[in-house]
């Protein structure tokens, strides 16, 4: 489903700023070579280009005439084949990552058409800053001012020259990596710590030289040495902190260097928040984009770091990228942590393994796996799923929740669940796990194992915590899936970080996050909010803004989440049946009881959907159509949208050929309005509210347009099979989509077994029903050639 960002004008103007062009024909864009270079041609919706690069060059030329600079913004990829489907080119002052940026929203977006051409389909010309004169220079990446090249003790810190090694010739003794880290060579002997022959020494800091946002380095190695030298002058020690990887290709995009007293993992640490973060630029260099110089402990200026810097091979990626760093403890010894922590008690393994083996005798499709520690062969994480869960994943695994509620409190058992939402919008179990620790390795193993158990069927979207190990594992196992942060975790961090702000800001913050409808509107309101309260330098606000695609509703609406609420808390699948105080001897019985209760609720909804008919509230044929197809719960949601559509006014604002644009406004509420685009040639429709993209159900705005156009039956593309009464057998529709014969047979076995269990349940409720069920089986058996 393709998202469409739409910016609306006022209802009285009855014209939308951005729309998809219809039948736009240009020969060579209608622009001569001279015009492209410097005439007064301005960008407009419908302008065509042969390539995205040609569009960028055109926008650069326009920017040079107008007086601003350009950066390459977001790109969007096809969910079908991963090719780039659209690109954004933005004003260089877009965002707030650097002090020079003002949150400007000016941009153009070009979209690839089926013909291979690129068409300008969205544009914003207004800037929120003063524009320069004629001849401004193109800027595709931010180029902030560089640091001067100070010297001390014959050492030069030269951020101007990429790949420049910073070496102190006055001290050539071997040093280890900063902050208690050593480079661990996997290719050497077991537990071997490498002493690289080529050694790079710590750069001596220069009096008066401090890190600042915008400082550039040729490599991450150079940045690390600079920060360590600075730390020696100021009086603290450095550790290498988190790294962040690209969701596209997995390459490292940013790194953090932190005070050695950051965190609370050891007695010597006290939660110090001082750090420096560097971000990779398109040029290959690195730039300081975030910085906190404040420490919460006493400093000791001039005190040497116990651990210096070893030279890290420069592989062209800026150093540090290809090196595994094993953290040493802070107690002075040099023993490497060879084993991971295990939060699962040893007594759990025999209990669970016995249970799994007994289940496999009853359920041929029962799956379980145990992770083994590569160092000592001990058991680590555990995953299991019965045949019902595996079958449910084939139907309702398109959007899932990785629930780690045990992390909220003092749970003694690290029990996690993977859940989906069925055609009754009820949670369904897709798998369970005991997570040994919260490392990337643990989550990577878990997601890969779940994917194997589900025959490789990948979700389109995932709701999970925003912790770095989980993010890294998700990107690696499910590339392309939209990761949405858990609402409870976002709320917790908001409560923690919004305490110092005035109540007026909190009110406007909530309004900005949860009431803006489009991406353009959110970015504009956020920019105004930050400027109003002078908060461009606030570290937390910068961080959450950079991660807005993972939690801001306006950015989530274009992705399918099967109706999982954006703002609400998702209740644990097992509720209060399994909690922190569940004793070992009762875990299995409580687990089975709660699971059976959930599945009984699902069976009741199946029965109600097939045997109960809700009352119709209109005389519209589409209501009768959807009553026949949808489950009871989903139909009521659709029915409410249909009834609410009567409270809206609809006005055509644009028409060209088969394409029309409508503005749909609520009666008595000028502020609630949305744009609907409709194609008469194929009945395709899209709405700026993006309800269909997000939930898979048509919104009241499109239904209003359909009513106006006298469309009496919904096109089949708008009736998602996953919401229908027979959604459980939807895998039959995918039989020719590349599913292997073995996986297809497994799906058929699970499907027939589930149908048979329901058949037996109803057939044994009375003697009369038993006779009827037996007769039906006999007749069916004849068709299957069971009987001769």
Curated annotation (Swiss-Prot):
* Organism listed in the record: Arabidopsis thaliana
| Occurrences of domain FAR1 (ranges) | 57-133, 225-301
Q: Where is the composition biased (Basic and acidic residues)?
A: 165-175
Protein's recorded name: Protein FAR1-RELATED SEQUENCE 12
What's its job?
Answer: Putative transcription activator involved in regulating light control of development.
- Report, as the record phrases it, the tissue specificity of this protein: Expressed in hypocotyls, rosette and cauline leaves, inflorescences stems, flowers and siliques.
What InterPro entries is this protein classified in? FAR1_DNA_bnd_dom (IPR004330), FHY3/FAR1 (IPR031052), MULE_transposase_dom (IPR018289), Znf_PMZ (IPR006564), Znf_SWIM (IPR007527)
Chief subcellular site? Answer: nucleus
Q: What PROSITE patterns does UniProt report for this protein, alphabetically?
A: ZF_SWIM (PS50966)
Q: One of this protein's GO BP terms?
A: regulation of DNA-templated transcription
- Protein location: Nucleus
Which Gene Ontology CC terms are recorded? nucleus
UniProt keywords, alphabetically: Metal-binding, Nucleus, Repeat, Zinc, Zinc-finger
Q: Which Pfam families match?
A: FAR1, MULE, SWIM
Compositional bias, Low complexity, is annotated for 142-151
KW Nucleus (keyword) present: yes
Family to which this protein belongs: Belongs to the FHY3/FAR1 family.
A Gene Ontology molecular function term for this protein is:
zinc ion binding
Q: Where is the MULE domain?
A: 399-495
């Amino acid at each position: 489903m393709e998202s469409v960002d739409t910016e609306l004008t006022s209802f009285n103007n009855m014209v939308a700023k951005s729309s998809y062009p219809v039948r736009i024909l240009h020969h060579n864009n209608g622009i001569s070579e001279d015009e492209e270079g410097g005439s007064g041609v301005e960008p407009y919706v419908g302008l065509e280009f042969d390539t995205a690069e040609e569009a960028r060059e055109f926008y650069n030329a326009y920017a040079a005439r107008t007086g601003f600079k350009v950066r390459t913004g977001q790109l969007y990829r096809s969910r079908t084949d991963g090719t780039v489907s659209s690109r954004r080119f933005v004003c260089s002052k877009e965002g707030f990552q650097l002090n020079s940026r003002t949150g400007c929203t000016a941009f153009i977006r070009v979209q690839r058409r089926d013909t291979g051409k690129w068409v300008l389909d969205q544009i914003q010309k207004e800037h929120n800053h003063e524009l320069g004169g004629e001849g401004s220079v193109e800027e595709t990446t931010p180029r902030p001012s560089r640091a001067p090249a100070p010297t001390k003790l014959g050492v030069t810190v030269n951020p101007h020259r990429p790949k420049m090694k910073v070496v102190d010739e006055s001290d050539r003794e071997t040093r280890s990596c900063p902050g208690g880290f050593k480079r661990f060579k996997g290719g050497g002997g077991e537990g071997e710590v490498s002493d690289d022959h080529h050694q790079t020494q710590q750069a001596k800091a220069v009096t008066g030289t401090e890190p600042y946002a915008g400082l550039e380095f040729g490599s991450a190695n150079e940045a690390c040495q600079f920060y360590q030298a600075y730390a020696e002058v100021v009086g603290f020690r450095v550790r290498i902190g988190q790294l962040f990887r690209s969701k596209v290709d997995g390459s490292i995009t940013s790194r953090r260097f932190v005070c050695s007293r950051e965190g609370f993992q050891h007695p010597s640490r006290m939660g110090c928040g001082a750090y420096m973060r560097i971000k990779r630029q398109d040029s290959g260099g690195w730039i300081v984009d975030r910085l906190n110089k404040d420490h919460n402990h006493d400093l000791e200026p001039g005190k040497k770091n116990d651990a210096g810097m070893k030279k890290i091979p420069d592989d062209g990626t800026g150093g540090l990228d290809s090196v595994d760093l094993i953290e040493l403890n802070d107690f002075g010894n040099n023993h490497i942590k060879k084993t991971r922590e295990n939060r699962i008690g040893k007594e759990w393994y025999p209990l669970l393994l016995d249970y799994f083996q007994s289940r496999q005798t009853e359920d041929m499709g029962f799956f379980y796996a145990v992770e083994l520690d590569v160092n000592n062969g001990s058991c680590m994480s555990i995953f299991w799923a019965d045949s019902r869960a595996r079958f449910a994943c084939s139907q309702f695994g398109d959007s899932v929740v990785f629930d780690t509620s045990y992390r909220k409190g003092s749970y003694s058992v690290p029990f996690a669940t993977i859940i989906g939402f069925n055609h009754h919008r009820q949670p369904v179990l897709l798998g369970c796990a005991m997570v040994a620790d919260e490392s990337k390795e643990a989550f990577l193993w878990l997601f890969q194992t779940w994917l194997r158990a589900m025959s490789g069927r990948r979700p389109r979207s995932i709701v999970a915590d925003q912790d770095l190990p989980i993010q890294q594992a998700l990107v690696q196992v499910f590339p392309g899936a939209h990761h949405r942060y858990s609402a409870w975790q976002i709320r917790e961090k908001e409560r923690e970080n919004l305490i110092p702000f005035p109540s007026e800001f909190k009110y406007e913050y909530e309004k900005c996050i949860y009431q803006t409808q489009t991406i353009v509107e959110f970015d504009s309101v956020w920019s105004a909010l930050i400027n109003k309260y002078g908060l461009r330098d606030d570290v937390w606000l910068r961080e959450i803004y950079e991660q807005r695609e993972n939690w801001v509703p306006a950015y989530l609406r274009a992705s399918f989440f099967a109706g999982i609420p954006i703002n609400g808390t998702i209740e644990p699948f097992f509720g209060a049946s399994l909690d922190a105080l569940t004793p070992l001897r009762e875990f299995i019985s409580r687990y089975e009881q709660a699971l059976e209760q959930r599945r009984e609720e699902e069976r009741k909804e199946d029965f109600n959907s097939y045997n109960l008919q809700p009352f119709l509230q209109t005389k519209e044929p589409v209501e009768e159509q959807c009553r026949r197809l949808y489950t009871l719960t989903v139909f009521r949601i659709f029915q409410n949208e249909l009834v609410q559509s009567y409270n809206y006014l609809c006005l055509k604002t644009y028409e060209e050929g088969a394409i029309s644009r409508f503005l749909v406004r609520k009666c008595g509420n000028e502020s609630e309005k949305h744009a609907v685009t409709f194609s008469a040639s194929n009945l395709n429709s899209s709405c700026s509210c993006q309800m269909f993209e997000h939930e898979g159900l048509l919104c009241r705005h499109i239904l209003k347009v359909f009513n106006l156009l006298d469309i009496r039956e919904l096109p089949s593309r708008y009736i998602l099979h996953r919401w229908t009464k027979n959604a459980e057998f939807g895998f039959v529709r995918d039989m020719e989509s590349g599913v292997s014969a073995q996986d297809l047979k497994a799906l058929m076995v699970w499907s027939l077994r589930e149908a048979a269990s329901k058949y037996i349940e109803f057939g044994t409720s009375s003697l009369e029903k038993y006779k009827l069920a037996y007769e039906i089986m006999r007749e069916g058996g004849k068709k299957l050639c069971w009987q001769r």
